[in-house]
Amino acid sequence: MLDFEEYYDHLYISPHFDDVSLSCGGQIFRHTAIGDSVLVVTVTGAEPPAGLQSEIVQNLHRRWADSLGETPEAIVAQRRAEDWEAFGVLRAGVLHLDFLDCIYRTSPDGVPLYPGPKDMFGAFNAGDGEVIEALAAALAGLPEAGQVYLPLGVGGHIDHGVTRRAGERAFQDVVYYEDYPYTMTPGALEAVLPIAARGEWQSETIWLTETALVGKTESVSAYRSQISSFFTGLDDLAAKLREEGQRVIADARADGEMVPSWAVGAERIWRRRAAFTLPSFEE
């Protein structure tokens, strides 16, 4: 997508190519089904640098070699193509920003900021302060939107946290989506949104019809290179997305919400009633 509108009804900010489809595919299906305009902005759309040989880069590139190719150019070209296909299913626009995934970011002297798998879910590196500032400026220059959606940061992935922080600086009125598949880890949602702090937040449940859930599943299935990261295959993908929808329904029912008889799944977004932020770099 090369031409953009001046205004969108819904603007979703996605840390990686597949995050918004995984977390919000059902609600986007619903938005576009009634004629609302949607733009999905993928933050880490930059071409990986050649020659970076950290542990995590080597592991992921070996896994992706068959589906994405072995060169940085091939990897990003295929991932962008998957993104366009996924949101073509949902009839949403796509924009790729030119920021590096955390696994490719380095210090000025070339040392990886996040060299190992566990580092992606650890503490922020102070070197990412400049990334947050630059990303906030880029996000502030996006088209106007009726509603902006940011990742809540469930699971603690560095890129999700960077995206949230930058988005909070760029936009005044935002809602937060629950980051799937990290929501499936017991306690992960509570870690970023403690039960004791729920009074500071207001949740909204988006109920999904069978058609919307199927549309979401088809969208996520477009990320063929990533399926093995979270699922054993397409059948497992469909089953787990349905399981996630049932998790949200169960949570809504526990909170006293009336579940429509036609709902086969759900997604949930959150609005802040009071200031609540992720821990700072210094903490």
Regions found by a protein language model. Name each.
Residues 15, 97-100, 146, 150-160, ...:
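Short, well-ordered beta-to-alpha junction loops that form the rim of enzyme active sites
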